[in-house]
């Protein structure tokens, strides 16, 4: 079972990383 906090943190980190990658590329 995944904890809501872990899912939120992972989702936020993934979203930020994706946006940064898109910006750099």
From Swiss-Prot:
Keywords carried by this UniProt record: NAD, Oxidoreductase, Tricarboxylic acid cycle
Oxidoreductase listed as a keyword: yes
Catalyses which reaction(s): (S)-malate + NAD(+) = oxaloacetate + NADH + H(+)
EC number(s) reported in the record: 1.1.1.37
GO molecular function (one): L-malate dehydrogenase (NAD+) activity
Gene3D superfamilies hit by this protein: NAD(P)-binding Rossmann-like Domain
GO biological process terms on file: tricarboxylic acid cycle
Keyword ATP-binding part of the UniProt annotation: no
Annotated NAD(+) binding sites: 11-17
Function: Catalyzes the reversible oxidation of malate to oxaloacetate.
Family: Belongs to the LDH/MDH superfamily. MDH type 2 family.
Protein name: Malate dehydrogenase
Taxonomic lineage of the native organism: Bacteria, Pseudomonadati, Pseudomonadota, Alphaproteobacteria, Caulobacterales
């Amino acid at each position: 079972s995944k904890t809501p906090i872990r899912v939120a943190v992972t989702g936020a980190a993934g979203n930020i990383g994706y946006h940064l990658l898109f910006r750099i590329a």
